[in-house]
Amino acid sequence: LETWLRTIDLCNDSQLTQDERGLWGITGGPTEGALKVLAAKAQLPAVEARLVAKIPFDSQYKYMSTLQHIDGEARVLITGAPDVIFAMCREQMSRHGAVPFEAQYWEEEMARFARQGLRMVAAACKPVSLDATTLNHEDLQEGLIFLGIAGMMDPPRPEAIDAIHACQTA
């Protein structure tokens, strides 16, 4: 769980902010912001983390990835659409370490989340050499270990609510 929480925290472009009155805010998108808040509320132990390289999120490939140095170890972290992340993973993390990826189980979980109307974000990681300084899409094609899925309520946008109301009263 800690590795999953650390991944959704560090492979994330949003930031938590606190103003002079002590009020919290989020910069960045609402999905990443929700993940950042979840990680913050978990009160993980502090680590020394340094971003080395990044592949920004793009709707064409549906993920973002970072190469991080975390407490003297190097890891590639990735978050994105579950179906895309599933296709990149051959293993999943368990209490006992990495085990074979159970695709059918996770596809059923994804379907269950979808039936509940949840927006889903999957996370995976892999250890790499501390000498690694670059990150490209090919680096993500093998060795990723699936960590889990976050399911979040995605309330309709105000314009969608207005459109539905207009249709109902037409």
Positions of PLM-derived features:
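Cytosolic catalytic regions of ATP/NTP-dependent phosphoryl-transfer enzymes
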Residues: L1-F146, M152, D162-A166, A170
